[in-house]
UniProtKB/Swiss-Prot annotation:
The family this protein is said to belong to: Belongs to the bacterial solute-binding protein 2 family.
Record function comment: Part of the ABC transporter complex RbsABC involved in ribose import. Binds ribose.
Predominant localisation class: periplasm
Naturally occurring in which organism (per UniProt): Salmonella typhimurium (strain LT2 / SGSC1412 / ATCC 700720)
GO molecular function: monosaccharide binding
GO BP term, pick one: transmembrane transport
Residues of the signal peptide: 1-25
Assembly: The complex is composed of an ATP-binding protein (RbsA), two transmembrane proteins (RbsC) and a solute-binding protein (RbsB).
Name the record gives this protein: Ribose import binding protein RbsB
GO CC terms in record: outer membrane-bounded periplasmic space
InterPro entries in UniProt: Peripla_BP_I (IPR028082), SBP_2_dom (IPR025997)
Pfam families, alphabetized: Peripla_BP_4 (PF13407)
UniProt KW Disulfide bond keyword: no
Length: 296
């Protein structure tokens, strides 16, 4: 064999290997996560991974870093690689529509996790009942701080279904218990922002009695601000039931957290994806349980 033919053969083998490496195998499920810089979504990913291992699937995970543009690029990458099914936890319920539509055009079934997509076609959505969770949080505040309590709400990322729905449920409790809402302000599901926003709000509202934070990260940030200000008597209720959140409840720092089961959301996503790939019928929505976690 001459050198020219050998070089051609080597190039062909290399090209074949590259295509094989980039293409998705039939037994692969793709998961696009809003951010892995949040313990809740790490637990969701871990639950999905465990179920994928159990069912014999390879799970490919891409992190959108809370950036809709990065999310769209991730989905574009997956469509080029020929993914057979997409699990997506949106960065933003509205902005994710472009990514969902891209997958639709590529004939890739889409399943949303935790946060909904307002545009595009989704075969199934798996999430906790966030409206109910928001109401449970408000009801617990009323039980401990009383009717008409002076409260502050720390909101999540504007545009996410989780923030909207938790806020909706909390507003039901506000109306039922005649709370005096001193402020409702976004802190983007972030602990540092929760700390900074709470510090600013305390200056304007030193008479606050209770805080509802739409996730545990913001709750822990708010808690630190309150501790620094010498207001340990202000009750703080979080949402998600992250390991840090539940530990703070156990230690008597957080009054409560509404525990989601993110590992079950991730596991259910893979279970439903398996059914879709097998051509089985699936439900449009799958609810995942919530529980109120308080110090025992």
């Amino acid at each position: 064999m001459n050198m020219k033919k050998l070089a051609t053969l080597v190039s062909a083998v290399a090209l074949s290997a590259t295509v094989s490496a980039n293409a998705m195998a039939k037994d692969t499920i793709a998961l696009v996560i809003s951010t892995l810089n949040n313990p809740f979504f790490v637990s969701l990913k871990d639950g999905a991974q465990k179920e994928a291992d159990k069912l014999g699937y390879n799970l490919v995970v891409l992190d959108s870093q809370n950036n809709p543009a990065k999310e769209l690029a991730n989905v574009q990458d997956l469509t080029v690689r020929g993914t057979k099914i997409l699990l997506i936890n949106p960065t933003d319920s509205d902005a994710v529509g472009n990514a969902v539509k891209m997958a639709n055009q590529a004939k890739i079934p889409v399943i949303t996790l935790d946060r909904q997509a307002t545009k595009g076609d989704v075969v199934s959505h798996i999430a906790s009942d966030n409206v109910l969770g928001g109401k449970i949080a408000g009801d617990y505040i009323a039980k401990k701080a009383g009717e008409g309590a002076k409260v502050i709400e720390l909101q999540g990322i504007a545009g996410t279904s989780a923030a909207r729905e938790r806020g909706e449920g909390f507003q039901q409790a506000v109306a039922a218990h005649k709370f005096n809402v001193l402020a409702s302000q976004p802190a983007d599901f972030d602990r540092t922002k929760g700390l900074n926003v709470m510090q600013n709000l305390l200056t304007a509202h030193p008479d606050v009695q209770a805080v509802f934070a739409q996730n545990d990260e913001m709750a822990l940030g708010a808690l630190r601000a309150l501790q620094t200000a010498g207001k340990a008597d202000v009750m703080v209720v979080g949402f998600d039931g992250t390991p840090d959140g539940e530990k703070a409840v156990k230690d008597g720092k957080l009054a409560a957290t509404i525990a989601q089961l993110p590992d079950q959301i991730g596991a259910k996503g893979v279970e439903v994806a398996d059914k879709v790939l097998k051509g089985e019928k699936v439900q449009a929505k799958y609810p995942v349980d919530l529980k109120l976690v308080i110090k025992q």
